[in-house]
Amino acid sequence: MEKIRLKLKAYDHRVLDRSVAAIVDAVKRTGAEIRGPIPMPTKMKRYTVLKSPHVNKDAREQFEIRIHGRMIDIVSATSDTIDSLMKLDLAPEIEVEIRSMDK
C-alpha cells in the first residue's frame, strides 16, 4: 500500500470541481481510502497595461486571472486504484500533479 497525493489546478473552479468529483468516484469504487478534496488558496495574478499605445500614462487597464487548486490524498492505493485513475478522461484545462509517498 502506498499514499498518493493529487494536486489539481485550473482557471475555472466549476470544471475543477467536476474533475475532482470524477476522481473521488473512481477512487471510492476501488475501495481505497481517500482524504479530501482539500481546497487550496486561490492564487490571483494581476496585469496592468496601458490603454493607449503612445501617451496618457494615467489611462490603464487591469486584468486578473485566478488559479484555483484542490488536493486529494489517497491513503491506501491499490493497483486497481491506479488503473482507474489512468483511465479517467479529465478536461484539458486541468493541470494534474501526482506524487507517490511511501509509508
Swiss-Prot record:
Name of the protein in its database record: Small ribosomal subunit protein uS10
Protein function: Involved in the binding of tRNA to the ribosomes.
Cellular component GO terms, alphabetical: ribonucleoprotein complex; ribosome
Disulfide bonds: none
Similarity section: Belongs to the universal ribosomal protein uS10 family.
Subunit structure: Part of the 30S ribosomal subunit.
InterPro entries: Ribosomal_uS10 (IPR001848), Ribosomal_uS10_CS (IPR018268), Ribosomal_uS10_dom (IPR027486), Ribosomal_uS10_dom_sf (IPR036838)
PANTHER family, sorted: 30S RIBOSOMAL PROTEIN S10 FAMILY MEMBER
Domain of life: Bacteria
SMART domains for this protein: Ribosomal_S10 (SM01403)
GO MF entries: structural constituent of ribosome; tRNA binding
Record GO biological process: translation
One Pfam family hit: Ribosomal_S10
Keyword terms of this UniProt record: Ribonucleoprotein, Ribosomal protein
